[in-house]
Amino acid sequence: MQCYTELLPPTGVTHSLALPFISESANNLVVARTSRLQIFSLLDVGPRPGGIEEQGVPKLVLEREYALPGTVTDLCRVKLLNTKSGGEAILLAFRNAKLALIEWDPGRYGICTISIHYYERDDSTSSPWVPDLSSCGSILSVDPSSRCAVFNFGIRNLAILPFHQPGDDLVMDDYGELDDERLGSHGLESGTDCDMTKESIAHRAPYSSSFVLPLAALDPSILHPISLAFLYEYREPTFGILYSQVATSNALLHERKDVVFYTVFTLDLEQRASTTLLSVSRLPSDLFKVVALPPPVGGALLIGSNELVHVDQAGKTNAVGVNEFSRQVSSFSMTDQSDLALRLEGCIVERLSETNGDLLLVPTTGEIVLVKFRLDGRSVSGISVHPIPPHAGGDIVKSAASSSAFLGDKRVFLGSEDADSILLGWSVPSSGTKKPRPQARHTEEDSGGFSDEDQSEDDVYEDDLYATVPEVVVDGRRPSAESFGSSLYNFREYDRLLNIGPLKDIAFGRSFTSLGGEENAGNDSGLELVASQGWDRSGGLAVMKRGLELQVLNSMRTDLASCVWTASVAHMEEAVSKTTTQAENRECHQYVVVSKATSAEREQSEVFRVEGQELRPFRAPEFNPNEDVTIDIGTLIGKNRVVQILRSEVRSYDGDLGLAQIYPVWDEDTSEERMAISSSLVDPYVAILRDDSTLLLLQADDSGDLDEVELNEQIANSKWTSCCLYFDKTGIFSSISATSDELAQNSMTLFLMTQDCRLFIYRLPDQKLLAIIEGVDCLPPVLSSEPPKRSTTREVLTEIVVADLGDSWSSFPYLIIRSRHDDLAVYRPFISITKSVGEPHADLNFLKETNLVLPRITSGVEDQSSTEEVIKSVPLRIVSNISGFSAIFRPGVSPGFIVRTSTSSPHFLGLKGGYAQSLSKFQTSECGEGFILLDSKVLCFILLCLTYCILSFHTGCHSYYPWTIQQIPIGEQVDHLAYSSSSGMYVIGTSHRTEFKLPEDDELHPEWRNEMTSFFPEVQRSSLKVVSPKTWTVIDSPAEHVMAVKNMSLEISENTHERKDMIVVGTAFARGEDIASRGCVYVFEVIKVVPDPKRPEMDRKLRLVGKEPVKGAVTALSEIGGQGFLIVAQGQKCIVRGLKEDGSLLPVAFMDVQCHVSVVKELKGTGMCIIADAVKGLWFAGYSEEPYKMSLFAKDLDYLEVLAADFLPDGNKLFILVADSDCNLHVLQYDPEDPKSSNGDRLLSRSKFHTGNFISTLTLLPRTSVSSEQMISDVDAMDVDIKIPRHQMLITSQNGSVGLVTCVSEESYRRLSALQSQLTNTIEHPCGLNPRAFRAVESDGTAGRGMLDGKLLFQWLDMSKQRKVEIASRVGANEWEIKADFEAISGEGLGYL
């Protein structure tokens, strides 16, 4: 019984779409990452302070994201009659023939599903000779006028979904009894369109009933559809389809040359009929895509592997060949630009502007190419292609693009599955001279110039695009196409989205970052996960860690310390203004104040002054001489005053910490003694909450003196449990009732929470009540002014904080709520416009963000009580402006930061190193920006915070949800990776593209010598490199195709039986499908050499120890047995070999295998191994040493196409996890005692689980006990033998996702399985999808208990307190048991990472 948990979601962008989605005037980018939907807004921001940008640039800001229980296959925009936001809707296509229509709901600040349509049960897909839907691609296209959408699925089926538009007859009818019956029974006339909506019949108006037609109904000759797209400028819905009557084939090119047709059909939605408008025949057979072009060009662009063909509305064609094969594969008339040598397979085409017809083309190599059309009025007379040179931004994209979106205003987004997705901008070189149209030089009748009439007609569509230096003819020659492209466009990068996919191989290595000072400098911080990521030129390494590592610069011991603060104060003689940030950083003294508890009621304040990286004791006799307990320390009046808030008084100091003012905390009206328990300080206000739950509000004047602010009756007479001040920069709180003139003056807000957990928001200084938020302690998904229903169960809250989260580009206020058990709830404020009888009313609501972080459970009752005391005394700490980032620090047993970037939602980033008692911002000119930390050992560390590199892509490091990721660019594709434990180095197998030429000395093929082509095919050429984890630089590069790289402990001497860690490399010589492959096994040792004095890190090199050429390609390697031998998969044999002293590899045992061995792995030290074949399933075998032999134990009879596999022991049970080629995960078990196993000859299928990702690696890892298991074992150590799983499986995928399979106990499985059923049936799923159907795999019924879905289970945490308790009671468990189960499956077992 296992559970699959997605630790990191997919990062590769598969689809993108630009549209006004959130509002009618918004500019949004919607991105699909396999099973993840993200909605971005485009924000124009100013240049970063201190940056190199001279002007503002657009940035992507994430609005919402959703984990979808389905795989997105396409996105299209639809303009409906009436949407809730006023913007457009999105039509999403999913795998297995599903469509979902969604819109933006401003009242929920999220998406709303209008309808769901599925065609997977259509009768047309049940034919025995039709492939399964999961094996077929699909095409979705929407009419530019949003009159209908067509969905091609199951190869030859076409679903048509009409939409209602103004003036259509569909708006007036189609609401009869037949429609109601169809909606109720989910049946259709020609299909199975299931329209599941929650709204009334009036809200079903956007669409009409869909119908399914075979493509043969349009034209009987459409037997092999290739691509289709709706066209622009037609009165009726009209689309063009690319198809052939016989299947295209490169191998049969001499018989099937130019067999492709392009036909344009117009649809009659009322009669469900079509009319053929035009048809173009004998098109090149390598055409694969139709791109509809908007005005002024119009028509369609047909893209082939070697050419581009344009077909206008009258059927006129223009074509251009971009490599020399265009003349060989087709007889179609086209312009010759074969000197470009472009490969167009899988390229992406996007328009560059709305005013001209220029197109951006990105081939799989990543280079940027410009496609231009020669226009004669509205007619296209020619096409030309121009590569953009590197100096004009032509090399910004490093790998293939998967999608594109035109965002307007000279901005284009390029999504990629193989590299980071990039937001591009382009500009035109400035000049005052018009440039004549240059496309004419590519036509035969070009005379070198144009008439004035032609020029004026072109200017209608060009505007000032061609306002560049005129073309100069030198010696009768014109500039090249490349220089021409650069003279028109300069491309630059505005923003990018992180992608760590595809992850091809992983290795675990030692981390060199130390978290201790001199006392524990020798202790490393555990392991780090290094993965090979990227494709082609974007290849590199990704270093991943579960938490934030901080580099210790200095440390000191300070006994009995309870808290630490820092204060940056300006010199007394210098006036530092509030707006002069640079002056503050240069002319300020940095003080560190450490509070030491001398008794239960007394604390001594020890003051240090920062000098360089050292803390020097500073004598401040007037600083807390009464040893009162310090609540908080901060600065006011532009860092001219230091304010120390004590329990009994507030003390104000000057720049040298001389006493300036004392303000008592007691109540002056009643003269009763009062004590401060919490405070909030934002210049110029100080809010103090006293022990009688009353509020004291102080304000500093221009001189720095504090005066009490007289509170209104409501604030003064109420009882408060928490207070927080916030300077409203965005105006979201003030905009509720303030005018535009008031926003600049009244931007300070005061948040107060009552004893019944009602949140009051006041504006300062007029103390106007802005909003009242009800039921905060219920923690519902949306906080509003309306009290929650059925709120019998509530959470005990201890603190609320309102602070900015974000980076220098985009920061936004968030409400953070902390509970008694140290749980955190993060809410984002938004304005909801409600339309009542009168004017529309704006209400302030708070949306709950997804939270997947559980606090650690401390062991023992005493530890829990002590932890609660720490939580009460050390509140959440607001950390602002750390390299432009704003975050919130949570102290305690689960320390970490709540962080957010402009392209990610708020998430918790744990701090590695265990317990942290207090933290404060620290900054000097010598060490830069960092923190000072107080840990459990009462050690005060000066830390260089790596947040500046972890949260900024400019340095190659990122924070990605609970993990930190550092990207190391290599510049080549990294296919294999191994960690050399003896040297501490990483050995990587890289590859790069190189041209393949036929050998001219081949005696069997003398005709190869006469080959005249200059456009050679490309193959991968491999090399080995050694990378240092200290500097992440390549230090050795010794070149055959690397198939496997492993680190093994091999026996290097037959006499002494000495063993040493070696790097074993398997290679293959593949020269074509008609020539047998050869291979070789290399054994290397990473040795130390004398480095170059200028580069001391270059002190390692690979030394060849052994080499063994073999027959057949070496496709997999593994260590086996206990004698230091290795097993080699070579061709159709698996041979166990031992390293001899002469460097040869002696075979000792073998086994014949199937076709192509993709995986060989041993259960370490047992001799049991799995041998997985790429097409013939998996074998379970064993190796014995006395005598040497290999034996077959069991087989997988399903003949799986194995991509990755590994063992997963669970107690006395042995499971094998197998990843197939259809994104499924199979759990097999070897159980010879089961009668179904035929005495152990068969591997039993226990469960099948659809991950939605193409899995690249499965790695068996040890599992550390989590805090809940440690607590149970401590309590029940003498009573019960607790069985804790010792193994887990780490999964990486091609799209960048990282998952974990964890074994769970019988009791936990029943509890979580029941919870999963409840969540599946009760919560609302995005796009109306069914998570149970998404994870299910069709089988013959032999599978047992299904694998649990951790991503679905964690949605229980986002529910309100009442719903959590209700669902937990239905499951028969309490909250603590469910949270303990969540902790076990959430990845906390990776304690060493």
From Swiss-Prot:
Residues 427-458 are annotated as: Disordered. It holds the Pfam family CPSF_A. It is found in: Nucleus. InterPro entries: Beta-prop_RSE1/DDB1/CPSF1_1st, Cleavage/polyA-sp_fac_asu_C, RSE1/DDB1/CFT1/CPSF1, WD40/YVTN_repeat-like_dom_sf. This is Protein cft1. Keywords: mRNA processing, Nucleus, RNA-binding. Belongs to the CFT1 family. The keyword Secreted does not apply. GO terms for molecular function: RNA binding. GO terms for biological process: mRNA processing. PANTHER family: DNA REPAIR/RNA PROCESSING CPSF FAMILY.
